[in-house]
A protein has these predicted regions:
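Extracytoplasmic catalytic/substrate-binding loops of multi-pass membrane glycan-assembly enzymes
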Residues: 62-76, 87-101, 257, 411-416
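Transmembrane-helix motifs of polytopic, lipid-linked glycan transferases
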Residues: 112-135, 171, 175
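Transmembrane-helix signature of polytopic, membrane-embedded enzymes
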Residues: 126-151
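Membrane-interface transmembrane helices that cradle and orient dolichyl/undecaprenyl
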Residues: 134, 170-189, 302-312, 358
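Short acidic/glycine- and proline-prone juxtamembrane loop motifs at membrane-interface regions
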Residues: 155-166
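Membrane-interface alpha helices of multi-pass inner-membrane proteins
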Residues: 188-206, 210-215, 326-331
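Hydrophobic/aromatic-rich transmembrane helices and adjacent perimembrane loops
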Residues: 335-379
Length: 518
């Protein structure tokens, strides 16, 4: 019996060694040739991206849950069909191509189609990147699920420019991921620059931060691999690709005479950052800080900076961690009104950190013996590692606008709509009106244009230059009617203007006052 048992053990050992040798030859062949990839889950991506679009765009537009800043962008898309041009007559800190898309969709629900296509494309390139860096197809699918959940919640009712830029950002990262996976393949850096340029003309500041993240990741990887010369080539190739797109599109602003305004508007979020003279600082720290903890940023940054990973994943995780910290700092130091959708700016870096949390291993398509060893679920680790706080944060981000709109301030919205109808009745289509309000809803509802590019006193007025511009525009253009939200503080100059040039219209409103020019 012992002889037979020994022969069986030897035979089993021979079979195991034979399988391992086949696995090694298969891996060697894949490394020498074109590496086999996991098939893309097209159907899942189409459904998940559609669900994320429905939650973040369609529902907010239908039920009036769009953020004030996003409402201003939608107003811009509608108003551009009436008259004027972007940056000169309409204020915005996003890119030119984004406003072209807003214009084509006329600022209405058609924009949902644009976002769905963007999210589908982003999912394709994100899946390819995860598969290239980790070889874990199933984990890459779970990454997509987490990504679409975060898009639906962080992008609920606003920050659509960031979401539309994601496919171009993730396409550039997919090319970087291919290089990190196989350093002998350093092609495609011209396309990286071109893709980043397109993303820049959609959402400038997040694109700059993402480009810096990629540059830092490549720099660290090339230094560690003693490929500094390759890094120089990659930098110049990317810069050339960026220039090929940037200059032709940017030249449009030169032709129209809006180049200076475009630069000023783009840099506004940076120029108005403040630490010591920021009245919103503590509120920003509490709001964005707690939500950041809720979505797991602290644990992801900690693992990104200190957890042991492969060289290629470490390069990405360190760069993404630093990019995420800078993005959070910009949000906390901002003087713009609070809104949960502004956290969508962290999506690019946050997604990269989630990707690097996938434990790298051999793909289940290569070795049967290694199929027995399965890494834990990315989705499960993400939730359990953060004590299920991401679910709490997602629910909070989705229901806070609903509670504000329909429970906390229903009267405010009802009176705003009623007064918009009254304004429409008492003015002609050529008349201009102004909303001294915390939301620019009046213009679309009354089908009237604003007399200034700064359509409310609470958006883009953190700088003295913009405050002066708003006041001068009101004095020079003198809107036919001015709607005043009594909860929004009136500037002294505006009070003087109202008392001298306007008379109060008698209404039943308790929260608004309506003024008409004398």
């Amino acid at each position: 019996m012992n002889v037979y048992e020994e022969k069986d053990e030897q035979l089993e050992e021979f079979r195991y060694q034979y399988r391992e040798r086949l696995d090694q030859e298969s891996e060697f062949g894949l490394e020498r040739g074109k590496k086999k990839r996991t098939p893309l889950p097209f159907f899942s991506m189409a459904i998940w991206s559609l669900a994320a679009t429905a939650v973040s765009v369609i529902l907010p537009l239908i039920f009036g849950l769009v953020s004030p800043q996003q409402m201003q962008d939608l107003y811009t898309g509608w108003a551009l069909h009436q008259s004027g041009q972007i940056y000169t007559d309409y204020y915005g800190s996003n890119g030119l191509l984004y406003y072209v898309l807003i214009y084509l969709s006329q600022g209405n629900i058609l924009f949902a189609l644009v976002e769905w296509l963007a999210l589908f494309g982003a999912g394709v390139f994100l899946f390819k990147s995860a598969d290239a860096l980790t070889g874990q197809g199933e984990q890459a699918r779970q990454l997509l699920l987490v990504f679409y959940l975060l898009v639906g919640s962080l992008g609920f009712g606003g920050s659509y420019a960031v979401v539309v830029a994601l496919p171009f950002l993730f396409y550039s990262f997919s090319l970087v991921a291919d290089y990190l996976d196989d350093p002998s393949n350093d092609k495609g850096f011209l396309r990286i620059g071109m893709s980043l340029a397109l993303a820049f003309f959609l959402s400038p500041i997040p694109t700059i931060l993402f480009a810096a993240t990629l540059a830092l990741s490549l720099f660290g990887f090339n230094i560690a691999q003693h490929r500094f010369a390759h890094g120089l080539y990659q930098f110049f190739a990317s810069a050339l690709g960026f220039s090929l797109i940037f200059y032709p599109i940017g030249y449009y602003t030169v032709l129209t005479g809006t180049f200076g305004d475009a630069i000023s508007h783009t840099l506004y979020p940076i120029d108005t950052l403040s630490l010591f003279s920021n009245a919103n600082l503590m509120e920003n720290v509490a709001f964005y800080g707690l939500l950041s903890i809720g979505v797991g940023i602290l644990t992801l940054i900690f693992s990104g900076l200190f957890q042991t990973k492969s060289a290629k994943q470490s390069a990405v995780s360190i760069g993404a961690s630093l990019g995420l910290l800078v993005t959070l700092a910009l949000l906390i130091l901002s003087k713009e009104p609070l809104h949960g959708s502004r956290l969508a700016a962290i999506l690019p870096s946050l997604t990269l950190l989630l990707l690097t949390n996938i434990r790298e291993g051999s793909s289940d398509r290569i070795s049967r013996s290694r199929r027995r060893v399965r890494s834990s679920s990315l989705f499960g680790r993400y939730l359990k590692g953060n004590f299920y706080l991401p679910l709490v944060a997602i629910v909070y981000l989705l229901f806070l606008p609903v509670l504000s709109r329909y429970i906390s301030h229903p009267t405010t919205y009802q009176e705003r709509e009623q007064l918009a109808s009254l304004v429409k009745q008492q003015t002609s289509s050529e008349d201009r009106v102004y909303a001294w309000d915390d939301r620019p809803d009046l213009y679309r509802a009354s089908e009237r244009l604003a007399p200034t590019s700064l359509v409310t006193p609470t958006l883009y007025t953190a700088s003295d230059e913009n405050k002066t511009k708003l006041m001068n525009d009101l004095k020079e253009n003198q809107p036919k009617m001015i709607l005043v939200n009594q909860k929004v503080a009136l500037w002294s100059d505006v009070e003087s203007l109202l008392s001298e040039k306007y008379e109060l219209v008698q209404t039943d409103s308790k929260e608004f006052k309506l003024y008409k020019s004398k």
